[in-house]
Regions:
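Short alpha-helical segments that sit at the start of domains
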Residues: 1-16
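Short amphipathic alpha-helical segments that mediate assembly, nucleic-acid/protein binding
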Residues: 10, 71-74, 98
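Short helix-capping/hinge SLiMs at alpha-helix to coil transitions
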Residues: 18-24, 53-55
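A short acidic, leucine-rich amphipathic alpha-helix
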Residues: 28-35
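Short amphipathic alpha-helical interaction segments
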Residues: 38-49
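A short, conserved structural fragment
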Residues: 51-61
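Minor-groove-contacting beta-hairpin "wing" of winged helix-turn-helix DNA-binding domains
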Residues: 60-69
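Long, low-complexity, charge-rich intrinsically disordered regions
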Residues: 76-109
Length: 109
């Protein structure tokens, strides 16, 4: 696949990420979003799509990076798995919550 085969927004993300090769050069979400003139949510969505297409873009608490070693890749995967587990717990709680949970709370007006 060639860079030109990607949508323009994705091309811009990939090009920007070339400056962040290695976990020690990770870039914060808000900084990258500002550089690319995207909302943080839009950028997250595009990075998730790129990851799904086989682009190795890792994320840790310090931001996004291109892994250069298996250890860096593993750290990014662990972060993603923890995020997935957290989302799964939230979905489970939301799914099981009573629709009148707010009315059931004592002391709320």
């Amino acid at each position: 696949m060639k860079l030109k085969d990607f949508p323009k927004t994705d091309q811009n993300i990939i090009t920007a990420m070339k400056s962040h090769i290695g976990i020690d050069r990770a870039i914060k979400l808000n900084t990258l979003a500002q550089q690319l003139k995207l909302t943080e949510r839009a950028l997250q969505g595009r990075i998730e799509a790129l990851q799904g297409m086989g682009c190795a873009i890792g994320s840790i608490d310090n931001g996004y990076f291109i892994p250069t070693t298996e250890e860096e890749r593993r750290l990014g995967i662990i972060k993603k798995m923890r995020t997935g587990s957290s989302i799964s717990r939230a979905v489970d709680g939301y799914n099981l919550a009573e629709l009148d949970w707010l009315e059931q709370l004592e002391g709320i007006k």
